[in-house]
A protein has these predicted regions:
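A conserved mid-protein helix/loop that constitutes part of the nucleotide-sugar donor-binding site
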Residues: 13-24, 172-195, 208-214, 295
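Short His-centered aromatic/hydrophobic patch
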Residues: 64-67, 85-91, 109
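A short, well-ordered alpha-helix in the C-terminal region of glycosyltransferases
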Residues: 310-323
Length: 331
């Protein structure tokens, strides 16, 4: 079986990171594959160094003749059995169906998208049951909608030395990961820090809200206890150094960072947004708080200590191993 994967994603993002992990896992499983991506040099290096045959295209929003022509040539000459397009732009860029075509077009959703971008697909994949229910509710045939979760790396690493980031070794350390975007609600996490005078926060990510978040930290008087780390590919040392992973998102289709925390044996507290409610079993493998409620978030954070923290981390690891490990997803 020949598989062509097409990803027109941004420079940074959870879906983009999982795309790379899945492509490398397929390569290790000896899947005959080829990928087409935007020309981000670091992503091409990640894929090529893992042995993945990689083509790059611009994937512009409109009138991108070169990308369309290039994809048509790959499909015509390489003749894949399956074309897996990631999210809306790649799905829209895939050559339109033709009578007698000899590949199956599968679209992978990264959120609650409009179905108009996926009209050329034969099947759709959602990474949560709720996403599958969503597309079926819009009229997509249930027999052509499939649930396939993500997986993350289980690689452990020694903790990043807190001294490097001028963080006390004995302070309770919170970790936030993701794009600095309104949907991620890191402003709520910063507000909660005002109720947590002994806690420190490492915030790893980039995005349009970075300047506003930095200003907010100063306004709240917590800037000395908050470290903005930028986008980090080496998250394992961050997890090893942290005490709690906080995911305060207002909107979160899945929550890759929760899976990463589970795989790294770190307890999780998250806002009860749609995908996170489906992922987390409250008081078992994590804690859920109302979205946008900084005092409630702070109160729950203060309650994750000692044996309770250890129990949440252990249950999270068990959930990851049961349903979200590489072997289960790839097979």
């Amino acid at each position: 079986m020949k598989l062509l994967q097409v990803m027109a994603g941004a420079r940074y993002g959870g879906a983009e990171e999982f795309f790379v992990r899945l492509a490398l896992a397929f390569e290790r499983a000896n899947v005959d594959q080829r990928v087409a991506v935007r020309g981000h040099p670091f992503r091409k290096k990640q894929l090529s160094s893992g042995g993945v045959r990689t083509d790059t295209f611009a994937f512009r929003r409109w009138l991108d003749v070169r990308t369309n022509f290039g994809l048509r040539n790959i499909i015509r000459d390489w003749r894949p059995d399956i074309v897996l397009t990631w999210m809306s732009r790649a799905s829209r860029a895939c050559p339109k169906p033709k009578l007698g075509r000899d590949f199956v077009h599968v679209g992978r959703l990264g959120g609650y998208y409009k179905l108009k971008y996926f009209r050329g697909c034969d099947h759709l994949i959602g990474n949560t049951p709720g996403m599958v229910d969503y597309v079926c509710g819009l009229g997509w045939p249930a027999e052509c909608a499939h649930y396939l979760p993500n997986f993350v790396s289980e690689r452990r690493a020694p903790p990043l030395d807190r001294k490097i980031l001028n963080t006390p070794g004995d302070a309770p350390l919170l970790l936030g990961l993701g794009r600095l975007h309104e949907n991620k609600a890191f402003d709520v996490l910063l507000d909660s820090m005002a109720f947590l005078p002994d806690h420190w926060l490492w915030l790893a990510g980039t995005g349009p809200q970075e300047a506003a978040l930095r200003s907010q930290a100063v306004r709240l008087g917590i800037e000395k206890r908050v470290r903005f780390l930028g986008w980090r590919d080496d998250v394992a040392p961050l997890f090893s150094a942290a005490n709690i992973l906080v995911c305060p998102s207002r909107s979160e289709p899945l929550g890759n960072v929760v899976l990463e925390a589970w795989a790294q044996h770190v307890p999780v507290i998250a806002a009860a947004s749609e995908g996170l409610q489906q992922l987390i079993d409250h008081e078992v493998n994590g804690l859920l708080v109302p979205t946008g409620d900084a005092p409630a978030l702070a109160k729950s954070i203060m309650g994750i200590t000692g044996a309770r923290a250890e129990a949440l981390a252990a249950s999270g690891w068990a959930s990851y191993r049961e349903s979200y490990n590489e072997g289960t997803v790839v097979s």
